[in-house]
Amino acid sequence: MARVPRHRRLVLPLLCLLFQGATALLFAIFVRYNHETDAALWHWGNHSNVDNEFYFRYPSFQDVHVMVFVGFGFLMVFLQRYGFSSVGFTFLVASLTLQWATLLQGFLHSFHGGHIHVGVESLINADFCAGAVLISFGAVLGKTGPAQLLLMALLEAVLFSVNEFILLSLLGVRDAGGSMTIHTFGAYFGLFLSWVLYRSQLEKSRHRQSSVYNSDLFAMIGTIFLWVFWPSFNSAPTALGDGQHRTVVNTYYSLTASTLSTFALSALVSGDGRLDMVHVQNAALAGGVVVGTSSEMMLTPFGALAAGFLAGTVSTLGYKFFTPILESRFKLQDTCGVHNLHGMPGVLGAILGVVVAALATHEAYGDGLQSVFPLIAKGQRSATSQAVYQLFGMFVTLVFASVGGSLGGLLLRLPFLDSPPDSQCFEDQVYWEVPGEQETETQRPLRGGESDTRA
């Protein structure tokens, strides 16, 4: 493989050092512990240690953190020669995003007295932002370099934070599990980014855009981690007590239903009755996405099952039929199929939230209406008005994602960012020391010459 020019080899370390130096300076100026983290403030109030929010929120934070770094990272290792990059760049991009999101979300949500005040909830919210960025990463997986990904993360985190603030704080939209703010935003930001970065000569690397037995097995590890911890992901920001409990129950049942529908549809559409690991690794997770908005609401266990089954069905059909259409007709190369796992289920989840919000009544929620729909409980909105705001929130998210992704694509076209050439996409050796291996251009896909597109 040709030696990389010196100026291109310096781009990544310079960007890493520049970004870290800038965020460290901003942390020194603005970031302080909140009242539950600061030693003096906590003990001044004579609180019991067991009342500290850490003990209520940390288990959820730990699960979400594992999802971001292990779940997303390993879900994307299906590419036969891109495992180092899938896990390694996930590690890099998420680490930058966590710092940057802490600042952005802090300025918007917890800035007072001239400082940003952080605690365990700040860590959870930063992880959510990182999740959206990694969803977008899936759309351009294998076609972008690490320097490009760092700039993508910087831009996307800004737009994510602004969109989240508009929806949750200004519009009063309910979206605890992020069907809109995380999944829909991340998916369509990534899709429009990929559309702008379209590669007409990607066929030169198509033989690498496939899996082998072991890479699929490792990707399945990511799926299992995500599947098991998804109830924590959706419930982490919800009100303690019945709201968090209900969110876990709804997500749990929705995931089981999406798994069953995925296995059923995968066997049906294969032609020979065999299962496709692409479907199982991804569409089985759609149940967690589709109830993100409504999981804290009175969706009912039956509603969760129905939503999950529909999401698994739509996602599986998307992988089989819709992804090839996106590339052939719309020139949209979605490496991981994020449109099928996060995009369409995210939009379905937003619509489900509209319906469930419209049905909210004092009789159904009792005093719990205050924690789920505070504006309805205070008489400031009717259930119908809340539903309209939920729908409007979805359209705002789509606008932010599409415009932001398009602008991000233009930014990532800057020549000094060291994008891999068309003939070297989906290849670890471009950016990593790969021990004991030499590139073998004669490797062919194992699935009848078809490339994988999944999330």
UniProtKB/Swiss-Prot annotation:
Q: Biological process (GO) annotations?
A: ammonium transmembrane transport; transepithelial ammonium transport
Q: Which residues lie on this side of the membrane: Extracellular?
A: 32-58, 105-121, 168-175, 238-248, 301, 365-390
Q: In which tissues is it expressed?
A: Expressed in kidney by connecting segments and collecting tubules. Also expressed in liver by perivenous hepatocytes. Expressed in the forestomach and the fundus of the stomach. Expressed in duodenum, jejunum, ileum and colon at the level of villous (at protein level). Specifically expressed in kidney where it is restricted to the epithelial linings of the convoluted tubules and the loop of Henle. Also detected in ovary. Expressed by hepatocytes and dermal hair follicles and papillae.
Q: Which residues have a glycan attached per UniProt?
A: 46
Does the record's keyword annotation contain Transmembrane? yes
Q: Keyword Transport, does the record have it? A: yes
A GO cellular component annotation here is: membrane
Topology class, membrane: Multi-pass membrane protein
Which stretches does the entry tag as region Disordered?
Answer: 434-455
Compositionally biased tracts (Basic and acidic residues)? 441-455
Q: Which reaction does it catalyse?
A: NH4(+)(in) = NH4(+)(out); methylamine(out) = methylamine(in); CO2(out) = CO2(in)
Listed transmembrane segments: 11-31, 59-79, 84-104, 122-142, 147-167, 176-198, 217-237, 249-269, 280-300, 302-322, 344-364, 391-411
Pfam families recorded for this chain? Ammonium_transp
Q: Which UniProt keywords apply?
A: Ammonia transport, Cell membrane, Glycoprotein, Membrane, Transmembrane, Transmembrane helix, Transport
Where does it live in the cell? Cell membrane; Basolateral cell membrane
Description of activity control: Inhibited by amiloride.
Effect of mutating residue 230 to A/F/L = Normal plasma membrane localization. Loss of transporter activity
Gene3D superfamilies assigned: Ammonium transporter AmtB like domains
Q: Which domain of life is it from?
A: Eukaryota
Subunit-level organization: Interacts (via C-terminus) with ANK2 and ANK3; required for targeting to the basolateral membrane.
Name listed for the protein in its UniProt record: Ammonium transporter Rh type B
Species: Mus musculus (Mouse)
